[in-house]
């Protein structure tokens, strides 16, 4: 791979942030369109989404309890699958009044989360034959030049790749417009691993109850590569239009 030919470097969640910006109006209508007292106006929300996208491009650190909760759960599952102790989070057992182990407590970023042990074991069993946190990358040709797409796949199994999600509320097709089921299968395909199936394995976490769901997608190169290319090229248009706001030189393959 000749890195000097690469014009841009994009990670999958950057494409998601760009999609959220493009769909600002639809997202606003979904959550606050019928609210008598919305937390912000539609124009204010679009400005907020724009800034979120710029921050994502620039890799500005952000604080999110929901993101930390997902990271902690992912790490617990990874450690169970790999039969190892975590170097990222502090984990301890949660017991009931009889001393029975009923959960796992994780401390991450000075936040404490508890997960039912039954849930942790169920999810880890599902991934017992998968490779956790597999780095992938591949070049995507575009009208602007070559773009390096890269990222970490949560779990790679022989016939399917997986992205583990945690959410407080799930609805069918929630991740249909996300980029992972295009970017990661594309990277594997370009590296000679033809793994067509992709799953979003979703854990809906309530205060007392939990539920698991699966969204499955099939990567079809003839259909999906043009979709991915258009998405990436539209993002490049945006980045070049606002280049003066971009401080992350890695985006332009300058470091």
Where are each of the predicted segments found?
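Generic alpha-helical secondary structure signal
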Residues: 12, 25, 32-35, 97, ...
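Non-catalytic C-terminal interaction segments of nucleic acid-processing enzymes
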Residues: 233-255
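Mg2+/Mn2+-dependent nuclease catalytic core
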Residues: 137-241
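A sequence-level detector of short, solvent-exposed, charge-rich linear segments
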Residues: 86-96, 180, 247, 251-254
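Metal-dependent nuclease catalytic cores that hydrolyze phosphodiester bonds in DNA/RNA
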Residues: 1-152
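Secondary-structure transition/capping residues
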Residues: 84-88, 195, 209, 246
């Amino acid at each position: 791979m000749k890195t000097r030919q690469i014009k841009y470097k994009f990670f999958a969640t950057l494409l998601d942030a760009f999609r959220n910006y493009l769909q600002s109006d639809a997202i606003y209508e979904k959550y606050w369109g019928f609210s008598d007292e919305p937390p912000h106006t539609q124009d204010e929300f679009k400005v907020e989404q724009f800034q979120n996208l710029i921050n994502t491009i620039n890799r500005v650190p952000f604080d999110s309890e929901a993101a930390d909760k997902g990271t902690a759960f992912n790490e617990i599952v990874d450690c169970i699958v790999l039969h190892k102790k975590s170097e990222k989070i502090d984990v301890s057992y949660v017991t009931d009044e009889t001393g029975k182990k009923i959960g796992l407590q994780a401390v991450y970023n000075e936040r404490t989360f508890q997960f039912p042990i039954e849930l942790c074991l169920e999810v880890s069993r599902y991934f017992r034959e998968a490779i956790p946190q597999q780095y992938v990358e591949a070049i995507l040709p575009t009208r602007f030049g070559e773009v390096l797409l890269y990222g970490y796949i949560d779990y790679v199994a022989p016939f399917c790749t997986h992205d583990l999600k945690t959410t407080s509320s799930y609805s069918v097709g929630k991740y249909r417009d996300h980029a992972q089921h295009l970017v990661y299968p594309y990277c594997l395909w370009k590296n000679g691993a033809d793994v067509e199936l992709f799953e979003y394995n979703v854990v809906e976490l309530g205060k007392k109850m939990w539920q698991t769901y699966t969204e499955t997608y099939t990567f079809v190169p003839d259909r999906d590569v043009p979709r991915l290319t258009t998405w990436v090229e539209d993002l490049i248009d945006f980045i070049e239009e606002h280049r003066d706001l971009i401080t992350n030189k890695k985006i332009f393959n300058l470091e």
